[in-house]
Structures are given as structure tokens and as C-alpha cells.
């Protein structure tokens, strides 16, 4: 289905709607007023309240959401969409003036040296007197990019809709290409949002265009001032190839996250929290733990066989963690048949390689989960769905090992002693990590979260200037 100015259309009408899309966009840009953040915030607040009151439960069940997890997901999504959360987001990323009644409401006059003039001022409008040029004035204003083309990923339910909401908060017109894995949730969310605030209709366009329909995707990209792409390295590389010259490319790529555990951090409470995180997220999120790294340094042990010492400690950890992981599985919703088959095939292949001596890995199998012990290595994607990797990584090798993957790192669940936390946190940040959390909150999200270390609303706007 397609959502075009608040109206649903059949997918067969895609080309017809694309033929008139450029004229619609130009009309809105020429004569429309960018929707104020308060309009979007109030609409999101109303939508969140309805969802919490169960108005969409029956429809969500029809989309395939199970009752237990559905309630938790609704609560998480609603917390991000509440008025207080979105107001805090706009205040943090764009400044208080953006919550006023007009984009042009704040005019500040300053005499500033060049080094003290913000390159990206949070105020919508600033009138400056340049140094050594007191006869002239310079006005800077932050405005929307114009048209954003969102190419969303399907690994998080509703993510495409949230991407559009952020584009709206920055005042942009938004064209969304739904991912193939989308179950219809994003279109329904945006449809309801437009019903709450009909003035948003000219700012939201949703297409369920297949990824192999390159001509249609190229047309949408040609209308855009910025392309927002969510996805893995392959998807981002493809977008780079067909993006029109000069268009701003905003990449929110797939990332790797892991747990780092010191000897002081190996406690039952920490391991239980980590296990529940792994099982609850099914390791499908960028913030999900794929690998557990242990701070094992055999050289400090004073014995001869360093490798034997390391492997012994890793095996001890795996044998301790596996039953904890199994307990988390028993408290979770069972996997669907397709996911179970996929994991079983991966582990069977790994077992055959183990027996053939083609791998340095050992699998500890549990009920509905597994731990794969690796002798060494860097962050990588696990088999997912409760099947985690365990590797040694002494803290002295932490930075050089992680720097090799610096562009793909996101969250670390840090399990350590309090006297170690500050040192390790700073070391992880220097290695390229974006977020350090406790073991159970790696995937906890709020409206104030940055995307890959950057604020999206700033990236969805630009600075314009006028001079007298």
C-alpha cells in the first residue's frame, strides 16, 4: 500500500503517483509552512495515549504481534512518543526556540569573535555583526533541508515511522520507502499520525516499493535534498552509487555491540541481566550483544602455558553462563519455526567444521541457546536468537583490537568493578564506542538518544545566511 497526502492507494498506482509527486513537493515548498514541532509532538502524544489504552491491540495482533511482547513494545514506543520526551529531544538537539510558535520567533543580536560563533547555532535565527566589519550585519538561520528520502531497515518494528517523525520534527517533507520486511506497522502509524494532525498530510509520503525497482527509487532520490539510509554496509554502498551528485547522504548503518567483562564483573546478577538482554532482543538490534569479551590476561597469572590458562578461564565462564542463558530462554516467547530452523542449520554447519578441524571454535549447546567459544578475534555478528560468541580480549589489547572495527561499533554492556568503570569507559570511548551501559540496558532507548553518536535533527537541517 501507498500513503500519499493522507490517502491510501494501491501499490499498482505507484508510477502514477510518482508522476505528480514533484509538483506536489514544489507546491508545498513554495506555499506551505513547515509544520511546527508542537504540532508533531501533540499528534505523537495523542497516538501514544491511544496505543497505551489498547485502541490498536486487535489491529496489532492481526499484524502478527504476540500479546505478551506487544504490551512491552507499545509501552517502549509510547515512552519515546510522549510529549515530555519529544520536547526534551527538540530542546536538546535544536534549542528552546524551536518550541515557540514560529520558526522565526527568536532573533538574537551578538558581537562575537569568529572562534565563538557556533557553526550550527541552535537558535532559528541569529543576527550577527562580523568583527572588523561593523557596517554590515549577518543573519544566520537554521531551516529544514527540504525533502528527505528515507530508506529504512526492517530489523526494528516501527523504525521507518520513527525516522519520518524525526524528519517532521525538523520541518521536512518526508518520502519513505518501506523495507521488504515491514509488516504494515509503519504505514499505519504514519496514517494515524496524519489523522491526528491533517496539516501533516503534504509532508508524509509512504511507498512500499520493492528494492529491485531501481527506476522508482532513483526518481524518489532525485526529489530529495537529503537521503536517510538505514542498513548494512552493502545497502549503504548501493545508495552511495545512485544518490544524485550533491545530495546530502545521512547514513545510519548497522552496528555491532558487545559485552566486556572483567573478573570483578562476573556476578550472578550481572550475568542474569546480560542473559535476559540477549534473549529478549534476540540479538537483532544494533545495540544487541553479539559477543562477550572477557578481560583475560594469562601473563598476569605467572604460569607457563598462557594459552591453556586463557582457554581454561573461558571454558569456566561458558559453563557458568550457559545455564543462566537457558533460564532466560524459558522465561521468553519461543522462536518461530523459521528462525529456529535457521539457527539450527548454522550451528550444525559449525559443528561439522569443528569435527573436521577447520575451526578454532567450540560450541556449548543449551536448550534454545548456545555459546560459541572462540580462541581470539574481534567483534562480529553472532548466529543471533540466543546464540552468543565468547572471546578473550585483555584490556591492554582492547583499543588496538576495536579500532580495526571502529566504524561499526555502537554499544558496550560493561560488567566490571566500580573502581574499574571510569578507566574502562574512557578507553572504550577512545576505541570508537558510542554508548556504554550496564548489562541489562544495552538496548534501552529514549527520545534523547543520539544516532551513531550524532543528533539526527541537526543533520536534517541546514544553516542559511542573509547579508545586507
What name fits each language-model region?
Residues 58-65, 69-80, 86-94, 98-103, ...:
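Core active-site phosphate/anionic-ligand binding loop and the adjoining beta-turn-alpha structural block
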Residues 419:
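Basic, glycine-rich polyanion-binding accessory segments appended to enzymes
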Residues 39, 43-50, 192-199, 324:
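Generic non-transmembrane alpha-helical segments
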Residues 148-151, 175, 292, 410-414:
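Short hydrophobic beta-strand segments
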Residues 1-140, 409-413:
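N-terminal Rossmann-like NAD(P)+-binding subdomain of aldehyde/semialdehyde dehydrogenases
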Residues 111, 131-279, 300-304:
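Rossmann-like NAD(P) dinucleotide-binding subdomain of oxidoreductase/dehydrogenase enzymes
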Residues 281-289, 293-411, 422-431, 436-468:
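NAD(P)-dependent aldehyde/semialdehyde dehydrogenase
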Residues 2, 8, 206, 248-250, ...:
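Conserved beta-strand scaffold positions in the cores of enzyme catalytic domains, especially
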Amino acid at each position: 500500500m501507498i500513503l500519499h497526502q493522507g490517502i491510501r492507494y494501491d501499490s499498482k498506482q505507484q508510477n502514477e503517483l510518482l508522476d505528480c509527486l514533484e509538483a506536489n513537493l514544489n507546491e508545498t515548498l513554495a506555499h506551505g509552512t513547515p509544520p511546527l514541532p508542537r504540532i508533531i509532538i501533540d499528534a505523537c502524544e495523542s497516538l501514544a495515549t491511544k496505543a497505551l489504552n489498547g485502541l490498536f491491540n486487535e489491529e496489532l495482533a492481526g499484524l502478527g504481534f504476540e500479546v505478551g511482547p506487544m504490551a512491552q513494545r507499545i509501552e517502549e514506543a509510547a515512552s519515546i512518543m510522549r510529549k515530555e520526551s519529544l520536547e526534551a529531544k527538540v530542546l536538546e538537539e535544536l534549542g528552546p526556540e524551536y518550541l515557540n510558535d514560529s520558526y522565526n520567533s527568536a532573533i538574537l543580536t551578538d558581537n562575537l569573535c569568529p572562534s565563538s560563533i557556533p557553526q550550527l547555532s541552535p537558535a532559528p535565527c541569529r543576527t550577527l555583526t562580523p568583527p572588523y566589519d561593523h557596517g554590515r550585519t549577518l543573519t544566520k538561520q537554521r531551516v529544514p533541508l527540504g525533502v528527505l528520502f528515507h530508506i529504512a531497515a526492517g530489523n526494528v518494528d516501527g523504525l521507518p515511522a520513527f525516522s519520518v517523525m524525526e524528519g517532521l520534527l525538523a520541518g521536512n517533507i518526508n518520502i519513505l520507502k518501506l523495507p521488504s520486511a515491514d509488516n504494515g506497522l509503519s504505514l499505519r502509524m504514519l496514517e494515524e499520525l496524519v489523522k491526528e494532525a491533517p496539516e501533516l498530510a503534504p509532508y508524509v509520503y509512504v511507498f512500499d516499493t520493492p528494492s529491485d525497482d531501481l527506476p522508482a527509487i532513483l526518481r524518489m532520490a532525485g526529489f530529495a535534498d537529503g537521503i536517510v539510509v538505514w542498513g548494512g554496509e552493502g545497502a549503504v554502498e548501493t545508495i552511495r552509487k545512485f544518490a544524485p551528485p550533491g545530495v546530502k547522504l545521512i547514513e545510519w548503518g548497522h552496528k555491532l555491540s558487545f559485552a566486556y567483562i572483567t573478573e570483578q564483573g562476573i556476578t550472578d546478577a550481572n550475568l542474569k541481566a546480560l542473559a535476559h538482554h540477549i534473549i529478549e532482543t534476540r540479538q537483532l538490534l544494533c545495540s544487541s550483544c553479539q559477543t562477550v569479551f572477557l578481560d583475560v590476561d594469562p601473563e598476569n597469572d605467572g604460569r607457563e602455558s598462557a594459552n591453556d590458562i586463557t582457554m581454561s578461564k573461558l571454558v569456566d565462564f561458558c559453563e557458568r553462563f550457559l545455564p543462566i542463558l537457558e533460564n532466560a530462554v524459558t522465561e521468553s516467547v519461543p522462536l518461530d519455526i523459521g528462525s529456529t530452523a535457521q539457527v539450527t542449520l548454522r550451528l550444525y554447519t559449525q559443528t561439522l567444521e569443528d569435527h573436521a578441524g577447520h575451526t578454532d571454535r567450540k560450541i556449548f549447546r543449551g536448550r534454545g541457546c548456545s555459546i560459541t567459544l572462540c580462541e581470539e578475534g574481534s567483534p562480529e555478528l553472532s548466529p543471533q536468537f540466543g546464540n552468543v560468541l565468547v572471546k578473550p580480549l585483555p584490556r591492554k589489547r582492547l583499543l588496538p583490537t576495536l579500532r580495526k572495527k571502529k566504524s561499526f561499533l555502537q554499544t558496550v554492556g560493561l560488567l566490571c568493578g566500580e573502581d574499574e568503570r571510569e578507566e574502562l569507559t574512557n578507553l572504550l570511548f577512545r576505541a570508537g564506542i558510542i554508548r556504554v551501559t550496564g548489562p541489562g540496558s544495552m538496548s534501552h532507548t529514549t527520545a534523547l538518544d543520539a544516532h551513531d553518536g550524532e543528533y539526527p535533527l541537526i543533520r536534517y537541517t541546514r544553516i542559511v545566511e542573509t547579508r545586507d
